[in-house]
Curated annotation (Swiss-Prot):
PANTHER family: EUKARYOTIC TRANSLATION INITIATION FACTOR 3 SUBUNIT G. It comes from Homo sapiens (Human). RNA-binding protein involved in alternative pre-RNA splicing and in cytoplasmic stress granules formation. Shows a preference for uridine-rich RNAs. Activates splicing of alternative exons with weak 5' splice sites followed by a U-rich stretch on its own pre-mRNA and on TIA1 mRNA. Promotes the inclusion of TIA1 exon 5 to give rise to the long isoform (isoform a) of TIA1. Acts downstream of the stress-induced phosphorylation of EIF2S1/EIF2A to promote the recruitment of untranslated mRNAs to cytoplasmic stress granules (SG). This is Nucleolysin TIAR. The RRM 2 domain is required for the binding to target RNA, and the RRM 1 and RRM 3 domains seem to contribute to the affinity of the interaction with RNA. GO terms for biological process: apoptotic process; defense response; negative regulation of cell population proliferation; positive regulation of hippo signaling; positive regulation of miRNA-mediated gene silencing; regulation of transcription by RNA polymerase II. Residues 352-363 have a biased composition (Pro residues). One of its GO terms (cellular component) is nucleus. The keyword Nucleus applies. The modification N6-acetyllysine is found at K122.
Amino acid sequence: MMEDDGQPRTLYVGNLSRDVTEVLILQLFSQIGPCKSCKMITEHTSNDPYCFVEFYEHRDAAAALAAMNGRKILGKEVKVNWATTPSSQKKDTSNHFHVFVGDLSPEITTEDIKSAFAPFGKISDARVVKDMATGKSKGYGFVSFYNKLDAENAIVHMGGQWLGGRQIRTNWATRKPPAPKSTQENNTKQLRFEDVVNQSSPKNCTVYCGGIASGLTDQLMRQTFSPFGQIMEIRVFPEKGYSFVRFSTHESAAHAIVSVNGTTIEGHVVKCYWGKESPDMTKNFQQVDYSQWGQWSQVYGNPQQYGQYMANGWQVPPYGVYGQPWNQQGFGVDQSPSAAWMGGFGAQPPQGQAPPPVIPPPNQAGYGMASYQTQ
């Protein structure tokens, strides 16, 4: 359960013997740190009793969690974990100012990012997003401030700073507005990182982004894709409404495809997928085999859901490596006033249709990214 400063201090202690009492629990846990209370829950069923132990200090609760989980009390191995707060009691941070923090090292914790951003003002919430199955960090998180100016300063001064061996990326995280009913019904398909990263060669670092009929610029693409990794090259074709973005790593490109596909940029729902690259990257534009779309539609045809930032109906953008079940409204990264990060998914080519062909101009010979052919 969360206190006013956001630090949990209450532990759940389960799988208890029916002979265990509140007094005994307090005696044992007080050896680690001063306890405020203990509440024993004994249900009139076959289930074992459990209790909640509240400490005065978060550090004592954390120490007790590490020390007591798996220990035997009166012959039974107890289970200790952080007590969860019912969603109805969660702090409402919907009107606070949320900062997206990307490119986090795997070892970075919620406490680490909270400490790093604390100098900029009072923080209402902070979270490193984790894979719900493995417990590993997905490489990004969020920090919420009470004050907008504090959040702005944090974005400006923390972007590019080193944290745990990596330069982090910061930007606004904005709440995704409800989609129209028709959009919700027709565009529910979501991409998973595990599927996308394996759809192309590990040497392929190029993303195709299409569907931007107006306002397409190099700067817009850089703002849109920079949170996902180092960009090596950008080629835009404004008259065609699409662009190619080449990253330094295959994984960064996969993150970008998963996160940007189906989002709204300059008022247009965009489509992102791999640009096909040949083993010899010095050759001219290579053609993308659009028969892959049949495979993609099968792979991505089942609705997927993602691990969420569990605070008042907010959700993280699927920026991380592992997608996990959840089903709420979405966080997105606001890239610019005119290109809001919408975090949505689902735009797919109509059946039997291929995206428009890319015809490289003569002065672009040797450009080793990707082009597309019709079937």
